[in-house]
């Protein structure tokens, strides 16, 4: 949708949905446009409202009015199980990241090939804010491609 208006608006920065699973940023041509024009990009939902972290064991029962009730992946037990499996694989591959392995991986994988990018993290509590403060260790291209392959296959 952003690409439809990008030449009219001519922004300095855009804020698309992008994470290891939702890749329209790449497939729409927006990533190429950002790179070609050296624009800033701030990724919205880099952990897809938490579902990509593998922290859920079952279909969550969000309270009425919680927007996550409308996100299909939260209602898909097969998807939830795959995210748990991905988390275990990541924690096994990156023991040096400790308890931050999943966040380092999810964010590092979307930032590695996007030099003008940042991510918007919605910290809901003190612990999440503390984790965010510890992030930022770079990953190799090979590690990032491995992480992406977990979520895109």
What are these regions (language model features)?
Residues 1-153:
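Beta/alpha (TIM)-barrel catalytic core signal, keyed to glycine-rich beta->alpha loops juxtaposed to Asp/Glu
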């Amino acid at each position: 949708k952003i690409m439809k208006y990008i030449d009219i608006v001519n922004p300095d920065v855009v804020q698309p949905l992008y994470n290891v699973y939702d890749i329209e940023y790449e497939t729409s041509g927006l990533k190429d446009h950002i790179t070609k024009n050296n624009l800033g990009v701030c990724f919205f939902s880099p952990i897809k409202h938490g579902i990509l972290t593998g922290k859920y064991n079952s279909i969550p029962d969000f309270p009425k009015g919680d927007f996550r009730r409308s996100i299909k992946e939260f209602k898909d037990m097969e998807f939830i199980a795959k995210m748990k499996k991905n988390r275990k694989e990541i924690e096994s591959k990156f023991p040096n990241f400790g308890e931050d392995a999943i966040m380092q991986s999810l964010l590092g994988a979307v930032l590695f090939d996007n030099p003008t990018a940042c991510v918007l993290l919605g910290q809901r509590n003190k612990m999440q804010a503390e984790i965010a403060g510890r992030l930022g260790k770079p990953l190799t291209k090979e590690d990032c491609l491995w992480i992406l392959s977990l979520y895109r296959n």
